[in-house]
């Protein structure tokens, strides 16, 4: 007997929101000089200046988050990403103006989930998806993410490149919406 999953529209989406911050770029050259006592000339020869524009934000989360409780119900056979976006979190001490870090400082990036020593790219964005207050990400296929999100701990990572160096930390929320699919027998019960 071949079982078909319940249509996606039958269940409300599961929404995961995670606050992240891209810290102020100290400058790779300066941090290496401070940490290792290297001379500036040696550093200039070995480090590409564009490395200062690479960012990585990650947060390790428990699989027991209340927003993920629907994943533990009987009969859930698949979880797929429906939508993903980044939302800017303005710094109340620094109103929008010159020198304010917004999402427009980003150039491109990807979103990954990691659990049980396995990592999967689930969404990405490029210049055309970026606005000062939000970034719409494009899904990278529709892989089943159930085992990632049901694990004891999983890591959400956003990484990519900036257009320019940040003058202040950049705070934002990564918001992921997931569709659940149920085994038809469990849906009827």
Each PLM stretch: what is its role?
Residues 123-182:
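Cysteine-clustered segments with highest specificity for TGF-beta superfamily mature ligands
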Residues 1-49:
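N-terminal leader/pro-regions and domain N-caps
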Residues 1-6, 12, 47-49, 109, ...:
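A short, solvent-exposed, low-complexity linear motif enriched for acidic/polar residues
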Residues 22-26, 83-92, 113-119, 160-166, ...:
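Beta-strand elements of well-folded, non-transmembrane domains
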Residues 94-118:
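Short, surface-exposed beta-strand/strand-loop-strand elements in extracellular ectodomains
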Residues 14-20, 59, 77, 84-86, ...:
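One face of beta-strands
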Residues 30-85:
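A short beta-strand-loop element at or near the start of a globular domain
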Residues 67-69, 89-99:
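Short amphipathic, basic-aromatic surface patches that mediate peripheral association
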């Amino acid at each position: 007997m071949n079982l078909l999953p319940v249509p996606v529209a039958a269940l409300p989406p599961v929404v995961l929101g995670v606050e992240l911050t891209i810290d102020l770029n100290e400058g790779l050259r300066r941090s290496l000089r401070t940490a290792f006592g290297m001379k500036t000339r040696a550093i200039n020869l070995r480090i590409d200046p564009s490395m200062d524009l690479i960012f990585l934000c990650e947060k390790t989360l428990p699989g027991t988050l209340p927003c993920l409780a629907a994943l533990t119900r009987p009969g859930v056979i698949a979880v797929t990403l429906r939508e993903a976006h980044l939302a800017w979190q303005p710094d109340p001490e620094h109103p929008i103006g010159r020198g304010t870090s917004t999402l427009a400082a980003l150039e491109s990036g990807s979103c990954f989930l990691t659990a049980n020593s396995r990592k999967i790219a689930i969404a990405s964005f490029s210049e055309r998806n970026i606005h000062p207050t939000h970034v719409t990400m494009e899904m990278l296929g529709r892989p089943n993410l159930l085992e990632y999100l049901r694990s004891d701990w999983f890591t959400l990572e956003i990484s990519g490149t900036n257009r320019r160096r940040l003058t202040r930390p950049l705070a934002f929320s990564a918001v992921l919406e997931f569709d659940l699919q149920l085994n038809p027998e469990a849906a009827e019960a």
